[in-house]
């Protein structure tokens, strides 16, 4: 019985010079997605995907590592400069932006797009430890 040939789709290297780095920083994790200007993802990384578990995911160091790995794979596509959009109140906000700069990407703008409710849902009750 002959095996059917399966054609695998290869990843095409895009030539993108300008992009957008979306940093989603929550209290539990930090997710960094780098896209082109139209929103098509070039690379992404998160603290959990790098092997950090539990409360270590929410550290600034984990956010820095996630930002570095996402920027390195995006620079293989020819990325040179990024606009940064930051969403969320987490501890990894500033360290993720600094890691993008130290990786060799030029940060042209930093935009805070954290959603603010106009008195919407009731927030979770205070934690008592």
From Swiss-Prot:
GO cellular component, one term: ribonucleoprotein complex
UniProt-recorded Gene Ontology molecular function terms: rRNA binding; structural constituent of ribosome
InterPro entries the UniProt entry points to: Ribosomal_uS11, Ribosomal_uS11_bac-type, Ribosomal_uS11_CS, Ribosomal_uS11_sf
Record Pfam families: Ribosomal_S11 (PF00411)
Presence of keyword Transferase: no
This protein's UniProt keywords: Ribonucleoprotein, Ribosomal protein, RNA-binding, rRNA-binding
Biological process, per Gene Ontology: translation
Physiological role: Located on the platform of the 30S subunit, it bridges several disparate RNA helices of the 16S rRNA. Forms part of the Shine-Dalgarno cleft in the 70S ribosome.
PANTHER family (alphabetical): 40S RIBOSOMAL PROTEIN S14/30S RIBOSOMAL PROTEIN S11
Quaternary organization: Part of the 30S ribosomal subunit. Interacts with proteins S7 and S18. Binds to IF-3.
Family designation: Belongs to the universal ribosomal protein uS11 family.
Name of the protein in its database record: Small ribosomal subunit protein uS11
Annotated organism of origin: Staphylococcus carnosus (strain TM300)
